[in-house]
Design a protein with these regions (language model features):
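Conserved C-terminal active-site "lid" loop/helix of NAD(P)H-dependent oxidoreductases
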Residues: 228, 286-322
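Non-catalytic, hydrophobic alpha-helical segments
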Residues: 231, 235, 249, 260, ...
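Amphipathic terminal alpha-helices
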Residues: 4-7, 313-314, 325-346
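NAD(P)-dependent short-chain dehydrogenase/reductase
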Residues: 139-142, 160, 164-240, 252-273
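Hydrophobic recognition helices of helix-based DNA-binding modules
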Residues: 117, 203, 264, 268, ...
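Short mixed-charge
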Residues: 268-290
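Residue-level signal for the nucleotide or nucleotide-sugar donor/cofactor binding architecture
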Residues: 66, 97, 105-108, 146, ...
Length: 346
């Protein structure tokens, strides 16, 4: 994908990963066609914040990936060299409320795009945004490409269906198809429904005196938090390879939600001390005796794997993948971005 004048198609371009990937590919000289949901105006704030909202080599088209005929028509018309399938239902919590919608949005859509590529651009490389949720509650850490797949949540199952479809089309039809097994990857462009952005925005508002505290769910859940631009660069590198494969993208370092909260508050020079257990735990600002973090079980997931941490050795070796921010740097970057946004909004 580093060759000029190549054309990449990105489903879900208005999301965090889609916008970051579009900026990366445009910077490499590629033409980019991004898809958005039909029947509504695309939300372009991320593209605009990245300075590419009106880029001359960026074109937006409406597409429902769950519509097989529409997928075939779009791929035939665009004739992309690479298809990055990033669209879909992206929140684990939402999948428990509507499992069928999650499976259709993530599983069926992948099959539709695989078939569209196979029929119309068989030499194109399809890259799927898979998920560490396909591992379920793994017995061993860290997880790699050979870790048994045992999805537990409906979201995990939907991603497992998509992941298995990519492997099947690769083996059965010789398609150039790869899956990026994405562990948690965050950035300034993360949606506010995700806990890391909820924290960065909440911390910014607390620092500005606009809020007093943040309410979270399970503080003990441990995740592997990376910086999203590193992950989309690895996906672009996957598309440039002659043959498809599966790649874990992760930092290899686990941190709890409590750790992320501590790092986010540290970015505004607030030190948290933690008291209590379970739903009674609170994070208190040292020296001010103010409760800044509370726990509410309403934010607990029905199932939450206690420890998810990835081994990205294959991606490091074959793609040159190298995480650039540690937890403190990631939290600081997100908080500083939200401080700037909140200051501008006054």
């Amino acid at each position: 994908m580093s060759a000029p004048h190549s054309c990449a198609m990105i489903t879900g371009i208005s999301g965090q990963d889609g916008a970051l990937l579009a900026a990366h590919l445009l910077g490499e000289g590629s033409d980019v066609v991004g898809t958005h949901r039909p029947g509504r105006a695309p939300d372009l704030w991320r593209l605009c914040e990245l300075g590419i909202g009106t880029h001359p080599r960026l074109r937006l088209v409406a597409l429902d990936p769950a519509d097989a005929a529409a997928c075939a028509e779009a791929v035939a018309r665009v004739q992309p060299d690479a298809v990055f399938h990033l669209a879909g239902q992206s929140r684990v919590a939402d999948s428990f409320r509507d499992p069928q919608a999650s499976i259709a949005a993530n599983g069926l859509s992948t099959v539709n795009l695989l078939e569209a590529v196979r029929a119309n651009v068989p030499r194109a490389h399809l890259v799927l945004a898979s998920s560490a949720e396909i591992f379920g509650a793994p017995q061993h850490a860290p997880q790699n490409e050979d870790t048994p797949l045992a999805a537990r949540s409906p979201y995990g199952l939907s991603k497992l269906i998509a992941h298995a479809a990519v492997a099947s089309w690769r083996a059965s039809f010789g398609l150039r198809a790869s899956s990026a097994i994405l562990f948690n990857h965050e950035s300034e462009l993360r949606g506010v429904v995700f806990v890391t952005r909820k924290l960065s925005l909440g911390v910014a508002r607390i620092a500005l005196g606009r809020e007093q505290s943040i309410t979270l769910g399970n503080l003990d859940a441990q995740r592997d938090f990376g910086y999203a631009p590193d992950y989309v660069a690895a996906m672009a590198a996957m598309a440039a390879r002659e043959h498809g494969n599966d790649y874990v993208l992760a930092t290899g370092v686990a941190a709890s939600i409590r750790d992320f909260a501590t790092a986010a508050f540290a970015a505004v020079d607030i030190v948290l001390d933690w008291f209590g257990d379970g739903v009674d735990e609170v994070g208190v600002e040292r020296g001010a005796d103010r409760v800044r973090v509370r726990v509410d079980p309403v934010f607990f997931r029905p199932f939450d794997a206690p420890l998810m941490v990835g081994d990205a050795s294959r991606a490091r070796r074959e793609l040159g993948f190298a995480p650039t921010l540690d937890l403190a740097g990631l939290a600081r970057r997100m908080v500083e971005a939200d401080l700037e946004r909140e200051t501008r909004s006054t």
